[in-house]
Amino acid sequence: KKGEWRTCQIVEPKENRACSFERIYFSRGSDVDIYQERKRLGKNLVDPILKAVDYDLNHTVFSFIPNTAEVAYFGMQEGLETYLNKLKKEWIADRSHLLHESELERILSMRIRCEKVAIKDIKLRTFISEGKTRDDLAAHVYDITYGSLVPFEDNLVIIDDSIVRGTTLKQSIIGILD
């Protein structure tokens, strides 16, 4: 009424924390900090993944969905390779005086099984559609690479960074893998 105003603090300011959605999803994919952060996210998954597959790398295939998860996948792959190389070194050191050439070759040839299990039709962008239309579209966006898994024997580990709706695996992939 008097035309006066004032500024006063009502609530104590809290720590400014960035939302992961804003930080990663809306950033440029070529930003070096985002690239490294996504790789670290993948590396951070290695220990829980190894426990989940009971450390059975011979019967585990690693992949990623959608394409935006590829950088985290590279980080996971690097972490798995570090683990496998440590394992190889331990096996060789433990058996160095008893190793036959064929056993040494078997140990050295061990690799992480990385495959492009799901293939997306890049012309279709499901996150911009709504409701039933989106669900129908999502069900037909992906196909799988047949023969990349041994049925009823292999584990499949997929990094999925579908942070908009998080429905890629549920609505598109799992149905075609069964």
Tell where the protein language model's regions lie, with residue ranges.
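PRPP-associated nucleotide enzymes
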Residues: K1-D178
